[in-house]
Amino acid sequence: MESFRQIKNNNVDLISNNDPLDKNRLLIEDLWESVLREECPDDQAERLIQLKELSYSKQMNGDSSKTFKNEIVDIVNSMDLAESIAAARAFSLYFQLVNILEQRVEEDRYIQSFTNKDVQKSHDNLDPFAPALARQNAPVTFRELFYRLRKLNVPPGKLEELLQEMDIRLVFTAHPTEIVRHTIRHKQTRVANLLKKIQIEQFLTKEEKNSLKNQLKEEVRLWWRTDELHQFKPSVLDEVDYALHYFQQVLFNAMPQLRGRIAEALTENYPDVQLPSQSFCNFGSWVGSDRDGNPSVTPEITWRTACYQRQLMLERYIIATSNLRDQLSVSMQWSQVSSSLLESLETDRVKFPEIYEARATRYRSEPYRLKLSYILEKLRLTQERNNLLSDNGWKFDLEGEIDNKNLDKVENLYYKSVNEFTYDLELIKNSLISTGLTCESVNTLLTQVHIFGFSLASLDIRQESTRHSDAIQELTNYLDLTMKYDQMSEEEKIKWLIDELNTKRPLIPSDVNWTKTTEETFSVFKMVKRLQQEFGSRICHSYVISMSHSASDLLEVLLLAKEMGLLDQNSQKSKLLVVPLFETVEDLKRAPEVMERLFKLDFYRSLLPKVGESFKPLQELMLGYSDSNKDSGFVSSNWEIHRAQIALQNLSSRNNILLRLFHGRGGSVGRGGGPAYQAILAQPSGTLKGRIKITEQGEVLASKYSLPELALYNLETVTTAVIQNSLVNNRLDATPEWNQLMSRLAETSRSHYRKLVHENPDLLNFFQEVTPIEEISKLQISSRPARRKKGAKDLSSLRAIPWVFGWTQSRFLLPSWFGVGTALSSELNSDPRQIELLRVLHQRWPFFRMLISKVEMTLSKVDLEVARYYVDTLGSRENKDSFDDIFEVISKEYNLTKSLILEITGKNKLLESDRDLKLSVSLRNKTIIPLGFLQVSLLRRLRDQTRQPPISEFIIDKDESRRAYSRSELLRGALLTINGIAAGMRNTG
């Protein structure tokens, strides 16, 4: 094997013999080659290894890229289908092994940073203000952050005030659903655990290390023989199960440690500052409740999702309570017990005589064990009731569809709310404390209960705005209003909606057969009311309106909520927090105007929930990164979101309203993704104030939450960034000259982007032909359609996720950078001296630095020679000239952008200041080349199948008897390459 070792020999400065990442890459490559040699025929294994080595060695030896890539193309095109599938699987396996390794090393580095008590001293000489903090690419730990804040003379009272108000919400989503199967994820976890054991080699004997390596090989060989592709399109409940896996396996046990680490860091630096609330960091979910464009998410599905979440929590609490019962063997012969606990035991004895008879003799002198036996019974009865509710659906009590005897038998015995469970645990805790004892396990369980409750995560409802206006249109047509609703102006709509909101009579007749769509819209609100009755308001409180354009969009939802009993007119309280989602650039620009109209409405203001010690009204507002980027490009999207935040915060402050911004960030840069720490630091000064809500996309869950320390690292990163942004204000956002410059860059970039993407009539054909977009839509990875409207083929109907996915697979990555070079060039052409200002912005302004950093990282992954091959091979003959023109525009913009990014950053090469990232991207770029050519080969064969006669000259199979491969077999091969490239690029859409 020469690949990684060759790079080691040729890049002494880049590779370290002592670095665990470098060291274990050799282990991974040896493992990969060993598995191939045992699982594939000899000639096939050697050919696959040769193919990977060719990518490394030819570039390392200085061969021209065109020459060695032609060699790869020749090898790929000579493969039959069986060999092609083996190659796709092999490269996919390789990249997934590398991903696991990098996650493991990242986890170890976090552990090291947490346990190294001297780490903060390296930052003593940092300029503590924004410029220096902006230069820190690496996230800081709580210990480092509090040490810095102390050096900055941040008053303890100011820090404590922020911590008490801190509210961090991470919302798991299912779009895109992670492309890797759940079964494969389990195998990856086992591989990660074995790697972890191997990495402590200094404590292992030679025999133990060899045994672990053999186990590792066995696991990977089993993985090789497991199907990577979903055999069926996952249902919404499958996606729910996938997302909740991370709560079950990692987050349930990890979350209590997060607050513990804050406590330790405060003790060292701010010993008198109180800890934040136990639930300062909590979770939400869209999985099973986001119905925007997904007809599979019905009211019944959302109900079953809530029941499933409660089932998982009850299972965890039963296990934890059972463990507590084993642990708390305190005897009354040797310890006092509080009178409150003894009184509760007497009450429980009356309610649960069977438990008393079964346990009293065994635990007659062990009150804690007896109390925990009663708690276990209550949890089991709660679980039994939950199963009945899940099985019979959300309508049962409304329509009397089932016999309630089974529910009656547990009435008054189960936990009606999580508060009752908490009360029982507090009794135990306080009794222990009163007698001089403590039990960390009780404290841990209480923290888990405070964070997760019985609900696990709150479910945000999301629906597109026109669904509500269409329902009201149908309603008003039935009521035969003088003026049709869709003919009203915005002012007339607002007046009519407010009048109806203030009217106590019902508006919606109960005996009308509405259209299916309208009936389902109404049913969602009915289901939410039932959810809140059963689970409490915590389970489902936010209603997100996608594609919000106007004030009436929010008032329509409030009117429907009122009609379904979710709005109390007497107390003027709403049980729903209505959250507008502004997605396009034009809507982002209009957002302050829309919200100002609403804030001026006394009725609307009165419905906002009052929070915190100040009891101020709270408005949650969501900003969409994906569609604004697809609409106007990377720079324009980010700048308009930045500006909107400042304007909305100023508006909220003037109206004495608290603002919680909900960032709809995707996994990829083209959808707002990237390092969370940098992104949060780059938020405008004064917009966070300890409150933030962020989506965690399905595709990145594994990279953030698959391992306990990795999850803690991500959570600590987000939390420290929120604290840092909130306390160390960067007032550079208010610099007029900088804002004017950014506005010009955004406008020029947007114009150039839209000229290609929206105004060039050939771009859509280009995208459909030279990327695997149509094949991506056939991947069984999500319950959600790739397009908003069934059968539509226009760009506007295509979702942002497959839009970014297609460009990523073909190595263009266009949404993440196109237009940047032209914008920068335009600025410099007007005044070459502006280069100095751009460099200052990069050094001192976190927002601009984040922008440039993301573009730089994305450019490093672009490979225009591979992209050119997609165009030449997959583009139709009749479109050759127009496609060549489009490629030339893209190529010119790439080269311009790259040169100017290097000029601004002062670098000679992309990523040269980030050694680990540069090495990771470099290795992936070299290894992924054959997979791209293989994908093109299979896509060409697949698409030729639809032509009569087929025109491809590629070999389908060397065996004459097996040449007639079906379209499904070719599709399978193509989909495997999509899997592999997604793993190699480390994201999908």
UniProtKB/Swiss-Prot annotation:
It catalyses: oxaloacetate + phosphate = phosphoenolpyruvate + hydrogencarbonate. GO terms for biological process: carbon fixation; oxaloacetate metabolic process; tricarboxylic acid cycle. It comes from the Bacteria. Its cofactor is Mg(2+). The keyword Lyase applies. GO terms for molecular function: magnesium ion binding; phosphoenolpyruvate carboxylase activity. InterPro entries: PEP_COase, PEP_COase_bac/pln-type, PEP_COase_Lys_AS, PEPCASE_His_AS, Pyrv/PenolPyrv_kinase-like_dom. Its EC number is 4.1.1.31. Keywords: Carbon dioxide fixation, Lyase, Magnesium. Pfam families: PEPcase. The active site is at residues 175, 630. One of its GO terms (cellular component) is cytosol. The keyword Magnesium applies. NCBIfam families: PRK00009.1. Belongs to the PEPCase type 1 family. Forms oxaloacetate, a four-carbon dicarboxylic acid source for the tricarboxylic acid cycle. This is Phosphoenolpyruvate carboxylase. It comes from Prochlorococcus marinus (strain MIT 9215). The gene is ppc.
